[in-house]
Amino acid sequence: FPPKEEMISDFNWYMHRHRENFTKEAFERRMEYGDEVLRNYYDKYINSWNKVVAVERNIRGVVYNGVPLKGKLDKLEFNGKEVNVVDYKSGNIDNAIPKMKAPHEKDPNGGDYWRQAVFYKILVDNYEQKEWKVISTEFDFIEPDKKGEYRKEKITISPEDMETVKQQITEVWNRIQARDFYTGCGKPDCHWCNFVKNNNLAVTLHDLEEEIAD
């Protein structure tokens, strides 16, 4: 792996490239915080990272249950043909835990991150150019929790999970095809809108529809 300073240099370059998005004080705080967090993150995992990986992998041309899908994945870790999908997250992991829950009585559609994990498996498993098989999706939080610990949460996906999300994907696609859904209802707690937004389906499928129309 590259040395730690190269990672920090990349972070600094990116921050300066987007300097206009911050006030002077916010930029300085973010630079200081990012430097500290990334150095500690590097030290935590440098000796355990999988070296057989693909990063920022675009997957296109997938058709699942008659629905065209595409996506960009942060990282794929390989053990032969078996894949662990890694999705990097920032923010407080404790606030994210409910989003990783499978469907239950209070949230029959499942959490946003849970749906994202299942969507990744559907996408990769049905990518005909490769014979990859997703065994898990891992959410890697680059910011420490309240105790200063860096944490990862891994989700394994069952056939029942895939069937649930398949039905959701199909429903979204049918509504888009009927020009019945574009921007959503605007309610922040709407399961429907959150599913589309967090799995990039609205953008992906809308873009595809425009391409077909052209």
Regions found by a protein language model. Give the residues of each.
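Short acidic (Asp/Glu) and glycine-rich catalytic loops that position anionic groups and cofactors
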Residues: 14-17, 89-101, 140-152
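A generic structural signal for short, non-catalytic loop/turn and secondary-structure boundary residues
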Residues: 47-52, 64, 130-132, 185-186
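Non-catalytic protein-protein interaction segments used by genome-maintenance enzymes to assemble
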Residues: 54-127
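A non-catalytic, helix-rich entry segment at domain boundaries
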Residues: 1-58, 62
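Residue-level signal for well-ordered alpha-helical scaffold segments within enzymatic catalytic domains
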Residues: 36, 40, 84, 119-122, ...
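Short, well-ordered strand-loop elements centered on a beta-strand within folded domains, enriched
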Residues: 8, 53, 82-87, 136, ...
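Metal-dependent nuclease catalytic regions and adjoining charged, substrate-binding loops involved
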Residues: 5, 110, 114, 121-214
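Conserved aromatic-histidine-acidic binding/catalytic patches
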Residues: 22, 26, 105-112, 157
